[in-house]
Amino acid sequence: MQNPLPEVMSPEHDKRTTTPMSKEANKFIRELDKKPGDLAVVSDFVKRNTGKRLPIGKRSNLYVRICDLSGTIYMGETFILESWEELYLPEPTKMEVLGTLESCCGIPPFPEWIVMVGEDQCVYAYGDEEILLFAYSVKQLVEEGIQETGISYKYPDDISDVDEEVLQQDEEIQKIRKKTREFVDKDAQEFQDFLNSLDASLLS
């Protein structure tokens, strides 16, 4: 199945296959090399290339569909991004959404994985209430694909009493927690309503 999205970079992005769009992606990587951790570079790249695809790894059938948070299932839920930045990693880390993980075979990964670039240069992905470390840089992701880092972060259930006391005193953190709980509870209720309606239709 041919993917309708235009490519930003060919999987074999060498001199023989250089195109204006592959130049754009190579420029993006060079800018990140010059300004490590500058999320404005990521934001500008996303704005210029929204809706296009960025292949990852030379032999992978996966790519990043470039978009910001509004192009994901979390459209309008900016507090979700704030929770990823503040509550998952060992230290608060600012992030910029690069896009969503997609497959060239036409079957999107489930759950939807949101790909982000951190101020620490690393590439992360959020899905199924977990953040995975995909690569240590955008360049590594594009050239070598998703890395088997074995590193993942879940919402911390085992926060120490001291850390929890500090978090309880942080009003912004509490707002993020409250909105996140409301979002999760809303999804759970909608899913339960769907199951109830399904049961009712089967019994009728």
Curated annotation (Swiss-Prot):
It holds the Pfam family US22. Residues 1-20 are annotated as: Disordered. It comes from the Viruses. InterPro entries: US22-like. This is Uncharacterized protein 005R. It comes from Frog virus 3 (isolate Goorha) (FV-3). The lineage of its organism: Viruses, Varidnaviria, Bamfordvirae, Nucleocytoviricota, Megaviricetes.
